From Swiss-Prot:
Subcellular location: Plastid, Chloroplast
Positions annotated to bind Zn(2+): 70, 72, 97, 100
Record gene name: rpoC1
CC cofactor: Mg(2+); Zn(2+)
Protein name, entry field: DNA-directed RNA polymerase subunit beta'
PANTHER family xref list: DNA-DIRECTED RNA POLYMERASE, DNA-DIRECTED RNA POLYMERASE SUBUNIT BETA
Catalysis performed (reactions): RNA(n) + a ribonucleoside 5'-triphosphate = RNA(n+1) + diphosphate
HAMAP family linked to this entry: RNApol_bact_RpoC1 (MF_01323)
Lineage of the species this protein comes from: Eukaryota, Viridiplantae, Streptophyta, Embryophyta, Tracheophyta
Amino acid sequence: MIDSKKKHQKLKITLVSPEQIRAWSETILPNGKRVGEVTNPDTLDPTTKKPQRDGLYCERIFGPVKSGVCACEKKPGQKKKGFAFVDRKKKKDSNFCKYCEVELVDSRIRRYRMGYIKLACPVAHIWYIKRVPSYIPTLIGKKKSEVIDLVYCNLFITRPAANRPTILRFRGLLQDENLPSWIGILFPYISSWNFVEFQERELATGGNAIQKRLTGLDLRILLTHSYMEWKKLLRNYKIQRTQREKNKIQKRKNFLVRRIKFVKYLIQAKIKPEWMVLCLLPVLPPELRPIFVLGEQIIAESDLNKLYQKVLIRNKNLQSSFEMQGDPLYSTGKRDFMTFQKRLLQEAVDALLDNDRSGEPGEDLFNRPYKSFSDVIAGKEGRFRANLLGKRVDYSGRSVIVVGPSLALHQCGLPREMAIKLFQPFLIRNLIRRGVAPNIRAAKSLIQGRKPFIWKILQRVMLGHPVLLNRAPTLHKFGILAFQPILVKEHAIRLHPSVCTGFNADFDGDQMAVHVPLSIEAILESRLLMFSHTNLLSPSSGSPITIPTQDMLLGLYILTADKNQDISEFRYHPSKSKKKISSKKNPCFSNYDDVFIAYQQKRVQLNSPLWLRWRVADGGILTSVDREVPIEIQHEPFGTSQEIYEHYAIQKNRMGKISNIYIRTTVGRILFNREIEKAFLSFSKLLESPQTNPVF
């Protein structure tokens, strides 16, 4: 129910009275007639394919199929021989056809205008009988099996008529000694056509019996009695000693608690219990149960139409039986058949509301069960979760995530086919501004052609538009972060592995949603607050949340590992070589560039040991030992010397000053050290910038 009187709209799902259903469904035409009741089970005319009058698609009830065109296919102001429109001078009748009685309004009215079916007998709502918990048995205090037998006319109950004692309810009259005499008195009523009157007065079954029982309930008295009984059972529970008696009392207490909660809700919501029995069945608007004409004879329609047709046909048959019951020739056997027709009507309404819980679910020609009203609104594909709560959002997409090791922390790889759809309006505007396309149609043609220059322009367009990546469930703020998109040719989203901790994601098939912020405020918020490289610490503990993953740690280990060789292989042997430190197995390099050139030329491997000349101005060597003792000290004839340690060597001149330092390392360690140096250098430049005000 949408409350249009208040500023904020709300959706409320509750039980309504038959009067409210009639108020929603009935419409007063300009000629004073009331329409809204659906009596014809037909949908479309088989020859003209037009809606049948008073049928499930009637234009008098639900509005015109075409905007401003009546069933006669005439627009306002046109004349047709044989009839005339209502006087156009009268404003109230200007949009009404006098002949077909169809209002000439917008066809969108067929999306929300309802109808109703007046049931020949009351029908109990299946949701309140067969579902758990079952509310109708809870209220009337009967077993669920007994209530089901009563609803489906397998059980009769005696009830008072007009608050007066009946024959079967006189206390003390039906005793064992006078039972034969009573059978003789009642037999003429049961075996003749007087049974109809006898049944209406003395017996009740079906939805009518449930309705009478619920109508006679006083909720406040029932609440008081239930509470008093619960207190009495609470005292008896402490007295009883056997476990069997305690279990019996506990079961009754649980039943009373359920009843008290439900009765309190009914009183608070001002709902009458008898509203759980239907007298008027609402008919959904036609646009919510569409029908499509695919050919001359082939028609595709919603399953709800088939279920509505079954209800209308059985309701019509029951009405005919009621009209014939006053006939003396109407035999008792046919009256039994009328009771059977009540059960058929109950089953038809059950199938419409919840086909899965009905006795025999209705099936189509391919033995597939029809989708009932419960199936339409329930589940992930239902009306609520698919259209109201979690409907698909514009400018959004979804795909599988894979690792992107070459991406920066604030970047993500966006598939080209997804990006060209998400940024199509921005791309069209850019093409028109550049003069590449004269209009929107030409721009769309270029985009559909996938010209090579389109991808370059698209990448420029994406520079000013960050995207939001979200992985469900979004449990904290790190579940949705902003990234700068980079075009990739694959169909998967590429993601930096360090940000997966915040998303609680891995690369085993997880999917993530992409959203494009549109407004200036959303783009600014994405850049200032939601970018991944600005969300590095957990707000709860202050610990880093963007940390290297196991794959990255394993890669760093492989990168910095070296071959375990003894240090004696790199000692100075003057008898074997003229070179001081290097040999064929351990080459010597003077700087980083020489190492990288040799690695590209495949003269050295990633983990091969080598000697690298270290910059003396950078200071000493950091070791794991505070004061490392040299393994060997070599003195030259010219006064120079060199000290050989475990991982480095130091050359000194005649004055004892350090002239050269050589460190024992690998290509992988040099690569790792260079990246660390670049990171510290960029960070120091950022701190030295006058626009930066760091807070520590």
